[in-house]
Swiss-Prot record:
Residues 124-161 are annotated as: LID. Its main location: cytoplasm. Pathway: Purine metabolism; AMP biosynthesis via salvage pathway; AMP from ADP: step 1/1. Catalyzes the reversible transfer of the terminal phosphate group between ATP and AMP. Plays an important role in cellular energy homeostasis and in adenine nucleotide metabolism. It comes from Thermococcus sibiricus (strain DSM 12597 / MM 739). This is Adenylate kinase. Residues 30-59 are annotated as: NMP. Pfam families: ADK, ADK_lid. CDD domains: ADK. Keywords: ATP-binding, Cytoplasm, Kinase, Metal-binding, Nucleotide biosynthesis, Nucleotide-binding, Transferase, Zinc.
Amino acid sequence: MNILIFGPPGSGKSTHSRRIIEKYNLEYIASGDIIRAEINKGNALGREMKKYIEKGDLLPDTVINTLVLSRLRKKRENFIIDGYPRTAEQVLALENFLYDHGIRIKLAIDIFISKEESITRISGRRICRQCGAVYHIKYNPSKVPGKCDICGGEVIQREDDTPEIVSRRYDIYINNMEPIIKFYKGQGVYVQINGHGGIEEVWERIRPLLDYIWNREKKKEEFE
C-alpha cells in the first residue's frame, strides 16, 4: 500500500503518518525530515536550502525531487510520503519515477485546516531534534517537558514556526495544491479529510479509509 499525505502547516499529517506506519508497517518518507537532515550537514547545499526554509518558501523543484526520489529508490513498495509532491512539476517527476518502476499510488490523503487553525497549532508545536517526533504544548505535550517520549531527545520549537512564516507557508501550500488535487482526483485516489478537532477525532476519520484500502489490496494479492 503506497500512500501520499498532504496538509498545510499544523494539519497533523506527520502525527497521523506515524500512526499509519505503525499500524500498517509502512516505510515513512518525510520530505521535511529529508530537508532538515540535508541542512544539518552544514554543506553549501544545506546552507542554501536553509535560506528558503527560513523565509517559508518552497525549495526549487530540482532540489527536492532529487532528495525525495533518491530516498524512494531505497524502498519502492509499502511506503507513505509525507509532504511531497508540493507543485505540479514535482507531481510530474514523482509520477515519471513511479511509472518507470511499476509503482502505483493507492491513496492521496489531504488533511485540510483553516489558516487560523494552522497558525494556532503551529505556535505551540514542538519537534524532537533527534527523531522528529511531533508534540504540542497544549494538545499533545511530551510526558517530560523538553524531552521526547520516543527517543529521549531534546524537544524544541522550530525557527520557521513563527506566525508570519506559517501564514506565508499556508498561502503557498494552498496556491500550489490545485493541480495536485486535480491530478490525484483524476487518478481516483484523492480524499480530503477534515483536520479540525483532536488527534483521535481526526484519526477516526482517516482509519476506516485506510482499513478499506489495506483490506482491498490484501484481497488482490490473494488472487495474484
